[in-house]
Structure formats: C-alpha cells, structure tokens
C-alpha cells in the first residue's frame, strides 16, 4: 500500500487533556511526571502514553490499553506513570526507536494484548531516502 500525500490523525481532539483549571492541552506534557528525572527524560514515555490512549479510543479491541479513558490531567498522568514502567528511558533517553516500540509492546502484553509497533527505517543520508510517494505503510 502506498501512502497518499495527505496523512492525518482522524480525531485529533481525542488527544486533548483537561487540566485542573479547565485549560485544555493538545496532548500531554512530560513536566506532569512527579519525579524530576521523569520530567527531564520523559518525552518518549509521554508520547507513548498519548499514542496508547489514542489507540484505546479508536480501536475497541485495544481499549484495555487505557480502560479508564479519562482525559483529565490527573488520570492521564497516572497512565504516563504506568507507561513509564515499560517505556523507560536509560541514561541517554530512548536513543533507539526499538526501545519505544518494545516498551509499548510490553505495556500491551501486560494488559493481555498483542501490539506490534512498526518502525519506519529512514536512511540518514537524504540521497538514499525513497520519495514520499514510494513509502509503504
């Protein structure tokens, strides 16, 4: 299957999170983690939590990834902390995409689900990259 020139998220508002003051953020913030190290190194686990919650909302069979489904900051921070246990940065963060994919698969497995995250291999040299139109999903 070839990707079209237009790729988008079907329901971006489903990633909105309401803060304690009623303000809405589009996605999560690693600064919500309770621990300073998590705040500094938590970009990967934060992104993983957003992805996993979106999958839980958009695919009923993946609802166990975030069964609460609550999109308030306190509840979502709880999800971020649970995801951290599987998508855990090392001293240099998540410096390989495989670390994030493996951690997300581990999080799903702990909930009785099989999740097979795909990785898009992109050569570092621009001249070796395929044209966008030839990239397959």
Segments from the language model and where they lie:
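Mid-length scaffold segments of soluble, non-membrane domains
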Residues: 103-110, 115-117
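Active-site-adjacent structural segments surrounding the nucleophilic cysteine of cysteine proteases
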Residues: 1-106
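Active-site-adjacent substructure of cysteine-protease-like catalytic cores
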Residues: 125-137
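Acidic carboxylate-rich catalytic motifs and surrounding loops in phosphoryl-/glycosyl-chemistry enzymes
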Residues: 115-126
């Amino acid at each position: 299957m070839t990707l079209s020139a237009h790729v988008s998220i079907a329901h971006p508002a489903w990633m909105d999170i309401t803060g304690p003051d009623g303000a809405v953020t589009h996605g999560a913030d690693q600064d919500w983690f309770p621990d300073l190290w998590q705040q500094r190194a938590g970009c990967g686990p934060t992104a993983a939590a957003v992805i996993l919650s979106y999958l839980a909302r958009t695919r009923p069979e993946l609802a166990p990834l975030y069964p609460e489904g609550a999109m308030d900051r306190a509840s979502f921070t709880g999800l971020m902390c649970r995801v951290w246990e599987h998508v855990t940065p090392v001293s240099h963060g998540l410096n390989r995409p495989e670390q994030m994919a493996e951690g997300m698969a581990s999080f799903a497995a702990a909930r009785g689900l099989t999740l097979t995250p795909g990785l898009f291999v992109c050569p570092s040299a621009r001249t070796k990259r395929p044209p966008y139109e030839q990239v397959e999903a």
